From Swiss-Prot:
This is Replication protein E1. A motif (Nuclear export signal) lies at residues 94-103. The lineage of its organism: Viruses, Monodnaviria, Shotokuvirae, Cossaviricota, Papovaviricetes. A motif (Nuclear localization signal) lies at residues 81-83. It is found in: Host nucleus. Can form hexamers. Interacts with E2 protein; this interaction increases E1 DNA binding specificity. Interacts with host DNA polymerase subunit POLA2. Interacts with host single stranded DNA-binding protein RPA1. Interacts with host TOP1; this interaction stimulates the enzymatic activity of TOP1. It catalyses: Couples ATP hydrolysis with the unwinding of duplex DNA by translocating in the 3'-5' direction; ATP + H2O = ADP + phosphate + H(+). The keyword Repressor does not apply. It is an enzyme of class 5 (isomerase). Residues 583-607 are annotated as: Disordered. It comes from Human papillomavirus 23.
């Protein structure tokens, strides 16, 4: 041990302590030193190197572990909540028949939007596929078919389907070789009414289908029926328009089937292929047909109707129709002429036009021109005769006479003033009927305007310079309920017109026209004779007072019937007393005369 071993002399730049080396000792010396070390007390310099305290504090390690376990548990519970979703196949394990009650498939669980990056457990759970194993449930065998009917197997297979309508459409196309939607147009509302219905019936018994052939005859004018078991196809043309609800209820009561076994839509009545389907199908010996073909099938399959449809639209024929039927408004012309499409080829051609609105405006404008020219050519006698000849029904002229006497008027005086009023004599062409409210002034005058087709003007429109324009198209006119402001306007601006002179009348969208005022009746609550501020109107207007309240019976019906028929009887009875000319002097001698013609048709040819 005393041998001098170790490094040699120190190198340059090294200190002398680096040359110190540990001295080796024997094993006995090492054991003695270890025993001596353990025998020393704990207060030695190396006592802090070993912590042998049994009650050492845990610190935050246990709390941290609890938090980590709690978070992990919450994450797993949340994951299970998202993943847990009972599939319809799992429910079917309880009962195989529950499969027929499924209306819609179950929804899969939603994927998590945010996935935390952890030690790998969460990621491994998310990798599990959302998969539910389908269990095969043996379906019950279809029951045997009833005598003359359809077995329960068809009904159960239909109920087991999730989309019954799609299955019916598929079976319809398989049986008849054509899509149901190609034959029909869709009605979204069950309340919409239609006369023609295409009905597809599924699963009805044969004896009930045969019985329906007779039962439907009392409801339909045409029946088309073909059966490919278990489907049956009907085309029913009912006598009156029916809604889908009514038709379905009728079939349910006849065929004893469920509502889901019926497809009901109206046919495409403007499609030539669809019309040919029904027309050619009726020739099939397996098809039952009752009644005559509906009009929409005939018009698209018969040769004469096809040639009639090729006729071009003639505006003059439309104008002639409107003139003959006294249609002046555009809405009335369009609506009533469209209703003639089933019987009039020109109306059918009108509906095929893309410029129907333009034709209606042109027709209304031309009819107004013709009517205005016809009215201006007539005398007052011819006009009164023209108006009352178009009033249907009988009336009592005594009702008008009794009402005038009830108001305290001398009928002879009224008749004389009314005669000069109709003749439109200067300063005698205006009558005033005044009195308290509810005495029948407006009722009396309005009934006269309606019978003679007069025009009514209102002072409420006096702010417009065109408020007197209706006087240009009238043989007789009425100004109802004239107030003091209205009398001031008449006294200031209309005295020249009441004199019977020619005045200039402003016309909208046209140049002012030169004309004379027609006979004018005015109703008011003010008497001009009692008003000294209008002295210039006293000689131009003759007054009649209605002082008594208009009478009604216990049922609130007027005691005096002032109707069109009453005025027609009044003019016929007092024609001569009113100074109206004899119609024989004006050409009304009873001979057949040619009516006004505004079309190029032949006089004695077909209309």
């Amino acid at each position: 041990m005393d041998d001098d071993k170790g490094t040699d002399t120190a190198k340059e730049g090294c200190s002398t302590w680096c040359l110190l080396e540990a001295a080796c000792s024997d094993d006995s010396d090492l054991d003695d030193s270890l025993e001596k070390l353990f025998e020393e007390n704990a207060e030695s310099d190396v006592s802090d190197l070993i912590n042998d305290d049994d009650n050492a504090a845990q610190g935050n390690s246990r709390e941290l572990l609890c938090q980590q376990e709690s978070e992990e548990c919450e994450q797993q519970i949340q994951y299970l909540k998202r993943k847990y979703n009972i599939s319809p196949e799992a429910v079917q394990q309880l009962s195989p028949r529950l499969q027929s009650l499924n209306l819609s498939p179950g929804h899969k669980s939603k994927r998590r939007l945010f996935v935390e990056q952890d030690s790998g457990l969460e990621l491994s759970l998310n990798e599990v596929e959302d998969f539910t194993q389908e269990l095969e449930v043996p379906a019950s065998a279809p029951g045997p078919a009833a005598q003359g009917g359809v077995g329960l197997g068809h009904i159960e297979s239909l109920l087991r389907c999730k989309n019954a309508k799609a299955v019916l459409l598929h079976k319809f196309k398989e049986g008849f070789g054509i899509s149901y939607n190609e034959l029909t147009r869709q009605f979204k509302s069950n309340k919409t009414c239609c006369k023609h219905w295409v009905l597809a019936i599924y699963g009805a018994k044969e004896e009930l289908i045969d019985a329906s052939k007779q039962l439907l005859q009392q409801h339909c004018s045409y029946i088309w029926l073909q059966t490919y078991t278990p489907m049956s196809l009907y085309l029913c043309c009912f006598n009156v328009a029916k809604s889908r609800e009514t038709v379905v209820k009728l079939l349910i009561s006849m065929l004893q089937i469920h509502e889901n076994h019926i497809l009901s839509e109206p046919p495409k009545n403007r499609s030539v292929p669809v019309a040919l389907f029904w027309y050619k199908g009726s020739m099939n010996p397996n098809v039952y047909a009752f009644g005559e073909y509906p009009e929409w099938i005939v018009t698209q399959t018969m040769i004469q109707h096809q040639t009639a449809d090729s006729i071009q639209f003639d505006l003059s024929r439309m104008i002639q129709w409107a003139y003959d039927n006294d249609h002046l408004d555009e809405c009335s012309i369009a609506y009533n002429y469209a209703k003639l499409a089933d019987t009039d080829s020109n109306a059918r051609a009108f509906l095929a036009q893309n410029s129907q609105a333009k034709h209606v405006r042109d027709c209304a404008q031309m009819v107004k021109h013709y009517k205005r020219g016809e009215m201006r050519e007539m005398t007052i006698s011819a006009w009164v005769h023209h108006c009352i000849s178009r009033i249907e029904g009988d009336g009592q002229w005594q009702d008008i006479v009794k009402f005038l006497r009830y108001q305290g008027l001398n009928f002879i005086v009224f008749l004389d003033k009314f005669r000069t009023f109709l003749q439109n004599f200067p300063k005698k062409n205006c009558l005033l009927i005044y009195g308290p409210p509810d005495t029948g002034k407006s009722m009396f005058t309005m009934s006269l305007m309606k019978a003679l087709r007069g025009q009514v003007i209102s002072f409420a429109n006096s702010k417009s310079q065109f408020w007197l324009q209706p006087l240009a198209d009238a043989k007789i006119a009425l100004l109802d309920d004239a107030t003091e402001v209205c009398w001031q306007y008449i006294d200031m601006f209309l005295r020249n017109g009441l004199d019977g002179n020619v005045v200039s009348l402003d016309m909208k969208h046209r140049a002012p026209c030169q004309m004379k005022f027609p006979p004018l009746i005015i109703t008011s609550n003010i008497s001009l004779k009692k008003e000294k501020k209008f002295p210039y109107l006293h000689s131009r207007i003759y007054e009649f007072e209605f002082p008594n309240r208009f009478p009604f019976d216990s049922d609130d019906k007027p005691l005096f019937k002032l109707t069109d028929q009453s005025w027609a009887s009044f003019f016929k009875r007092l024609w001569i007393q009113l100074g109206l000319s004899d119609q024989e002097d004006e050409g009304e001698d009873g001979s057949t005369q040619r009516t006004f013609q505004c079309t190029t048709r032949q006089v004695n040819g077909p209309v």
